[in-house]
Design a protein with these regions (language model features):
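Conserved acidic
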Residues: 391, 395, 408-411
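Short catalytic-loop micro-motif centered on adjacent basic/acidic residues
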Residues: 409-412, 437, 458
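N-terminal hydrophobic targeting/anchoring segments and the immediately downstream early-domain regions
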Residues: 32-387, 394-401, 418-429, 435, ...
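Extracellular glycan-binding segments that recognize GlcNAc-based cell-wall polysaccharides
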Residues: 585-706
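Short acidic catalytic loops
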Residues: 73-74, 405-415
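Secretory targeting and sorting signals
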Residues: 2-33
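Histidine-centered active-site/metal-ligand motif
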Residues: 75-77, 285, 321-322, 414, ...
Length: 706
């Protein structure tokens, strides 16, 4: 070879290499060559930490019809470890000190779980377990342990990567359970705990943001408006909605059926929660309160909650014959309501095996009651009386109307059927879509009423075949009303959750693709523990929810998976409809205070007045209506169509009533009690007793009345 030619070629090769290097350094990156972490990958994840075990880019944008995609979990409790006194749920969603600090058991569970008292009550057995979390996780988290953290942030991240796009984080606590539980590191005020959990949710957002390079860059995005949520989902991130599920919101407890809160307390409480970002909430949970009666719990858990109800309110649950086909859960010491047939059979076998432990739990519950107080026995009357006699109170109706005024969504799952019926009637009168049933606690007879309003329903996280079967039961109704469907995992909420697959055949095979097809999920690994939905169960921790959805698919539920992936759109449409709501009505509230008398007003009731009834009156004039005025008489007030207030002191107009009956209206009479010179309004022609009926004022829209 000619050495000069070889040298010449070498020189050109060298020049080419130099130019290529310059291009790589100064020019744009070659197509497909990553210049660093992708947008969905953190730049600074703590080490060590849980793995996510998902590859592929999260889907973004919309489908061909302009709809967002992704499944919704409308009921989960990320921060329940901050409620109930701080030591009922062990472990945290995140910790600045790392995974070993976040995923560790409560101090009293060491060395062998013998003091895991709440586990004994809710799960039976003796509570013994290996308390060590990171890195071994021998015994927890588990689908059947109510007291160990299930929503570590990296597990939530895996759910997002697996297709979730809406997460409703319900702040939860219970002051009575907190006060009764032996171990706590803080006070038991419910609203203080709710505020802390909201704060921690925002701190989690900042924690994730820091991993991704700064504020706003992370995948965990708290949203307060539906259009904001839609934008977040289109970016491929997780929209997080704040909710509240507590037993005595705003301090609205009842003692011996006497309310301990006022309209002003409700308004202040709703204003505060809305300002903090809360957009959905329950008005009652577990205990009958000043707003509504509850849907009973069953089994040992129901027994414990009924005891707590007495300690909180001085009253046990009280039943009455149901007015229709809808009914509340049975109270007796039997199995928990909500299990599948197979689950009931398994639970029955376990109950027999753990009879001694269950008897011990019952003894502990009875021991919490004052001496001489016994739990009522409901078993003999369950067939004839299975409904809570307590419904939606006048204060509760005011709270429902207050939520519609603030465009918040009402959760009705824990309401008694009487309360749910009354709440739905209020919302129907208002033509308000913001009604939710998010974890399978609503009587299914209300389903069409919820869909007709434009509300949203999710199914509880049962075994995959059972969930699919339940989803299909009302698929035709969803198609009729254009409603979406979702999941309510209720993780960290002491709920029954699915364990290992009952059938060994046709297992979930790893790795598998996410429902959209764009990501690949392998077995999830945390520390030394490898999780598998086939042997551990989808209800073990939050990172296995995508695996459980894959289980739905492989067991013949592709149609259900397809519908779940439209759930985010369905939830947002319900939320969006609340934003466009403007009620033509104002509440007309009847109140009473001893030694003062009655008043009926569209303004907040003064201090000391209790609520007796609520109606709706029109805010603006309409054909066939007349205006009513409130007038002060001594310490009470009367209503009149006379702008001059019949010579009494004017307090202002209350609204317009119809002069003739219209659909949904009730008559409104002015009544008088001569012995105490007291006026009041009623929709009863007999004026509720031997009182004087002074005349018909008009016709108001029914909400509730005496």
């Amino acid at each position: 070879m000619d050495r000069r030619r070889a040298f010449g070629r070498s020189r050109y090769v060298l020049i080419g290499l130099v130019l290529a290097m310059v291009t790589l350094v100064l020019g744009p990156a070659a197509a497909g060559a990553p210049a660093g972490p992708q947008w969905w990958e953190p730049v600074a994840r703590p080490a060590p930490d849980s793995q996510v075990n998902v590859s592929g880019e999260p889907f973004t944008g919309t489908d061909a019809q302009g709809r967002v995609r992704g499944y919704v979990d409308a009921h989960v409790h990320l921060m329940s470890n901050e409620g109930f006194g701080g030591r009922l749920v062990c472990g945290k969603v995140f910790s600045a000190a790392g995974v070993a600090d976040a995923l560790k058991d409560c101090p009293e569970h060491y060395p062998d779980g013998v003091l895991a008292l709440f586990d004994m009550i809710t799960n039976g057995g003796d509570g013994r377990h290996d308390p060590n979390g990171w890195p071994t996780f021998r015994d927890w988290p588990a689908h059947d342990s109510a007291t160990h953290q299930q929503t570590y942030y990296a597990w939530v991240e895996r759910a997002w990567r697996g297709g979730q796009r809406v997460l409703v984080n319900d702040m939860v606590t219970n002051g009575v359970i907190c006060s009764l539980y032996f171990f706590k590191d803080r006070g038991c005020d419910e609203m203080t705990a709710i505020r802390l959990q909201i704060q921690k949710t925002y701190e989690l957002q900042a924690y994730v943001d820091a991993m991704y390079g700064g504020a706003g860059k992370g995948w965990f995005r708290v949203v307060t408006e539906p259009d904001q949520a839609r934008k977040v989902i289109q970016e491929g991130k997780l929209a997080v909605v704040l909710g509240v599920e507590t037993s005595e919101p705003f301090g609205c407890k009842q003692v011996l059926d006497n309310a301990r809160c006022t309209m002003a307390d409700i308004d202040r409480g709703l204003d505060e929660l809305h300002r903090l970002g809360v957009r959905s909430m329950f008005l009652c949970h577990k205990f009958d309160n000043a707003l509504c009666g509850v849907r009973f719990d069953s089994g040992t858990q129901g027994m414990a909650i009924n005891a707590g109800q007495f300690l909180s309110t001085g009253t046990f649950w009280s039943t009455e014959p149901c007015a229709g086909p809808e009914h509340d859960n049975p109270i007796g010491f039997g199995l928990a309501a909500g299990l599948t047939a197979e689950g009931r059979a398994d639970a029955g076998a376990e109950a027999g095996a753990d009879a001694g432990a269950e008897a011990d739990a019952h003894a502990r519950i009875r021991g919490a009651l004052p001496e001489g107080v016994e739990l009522p026995q409901y078993d003999a009357s369950l067939q004839a009386a299975q409904c809570n006699r307590r419904g939606l109170t006048a204060l509760g109706e005011y709270a429902v109307l207050g939520m519609t005024k603030r465009n918040m969504m009402l959760e009705i799952d824990h309401m008694s059927v009487k309360a749910a019926n009354q709440a739905l009637r209020v919302l129907e009168t208002q033509h308000y879509s913001g009604v939710l049933s998010t974890h399978g606690w609503m009587d299914e007879n209300w389903t069409e009423r919820v869909y007709r309003l434009g509300g949203f329903i999710t199914g509880h996280m049962y075994e995959a075949p059972a969930f699919a079967a339940e989803a299909r039961e009302h698929a035709a109704l969803r198609a009729k009303y254009g409603a979406g469907y979702g999941i309510g995992t209720d993780m960290n909420g002491f709920a029954w959750l699915p364990g290992p697959r009952a059938a060994a055949g046709n297992p979930v095979r790893y790795p598998f693709r996410s429902p959209d097809g764009g990501s690949v999920l392998d077995r999830q690994v945390t520390g030394q523990r490898v999780w598998d939905v086939n042997t551990d169960g989808g209800g073990t921790h939050y990172g296995l929810v995508p695996d459980w959805i894959e289980d739905i698919r492989v067991t013949g539920g592709q149609d259900v998976v397809d519908e779940l992936m439209q759930g985010a759109e369905g939830y947002l449409r319900t939320w969006e409809r609340t934003r466009g709501h403007s009620s033509p009505y104002a509440p007309l509230v009847r109140g009473y205070r001893p030694h003062a008398g009655h008043l009926a007003s569209s303004r907040p009731l003064p201090a000391g007045f209790t609520h007796e009834a609520v109606w709706n009156v029109l805010r603006d004039p309409a054909p066939g209506t007349i205006r009513l005025y409130e007038c002060k008489v001594a310490d009470h007030s009367l209503l009149t169509p006379d702008p001059g207030c019949e010579g009494q002191q004017p307090l202002g107009p209350v609204g317009y009533v119809y002069t003739k009956p219209v659909p949904g209206s009730v008559p409104l009479y002015r009544c008088y009690i001569p012995s105490v010179f007291d006026h009041f309004v009623s929709n009863r022609a007999d004026c509720e007793g031997p009182y004087v009926k002074e005349g018909l004022l008009g016709h108001a829209m029914a909400v509730s009345g005496p």
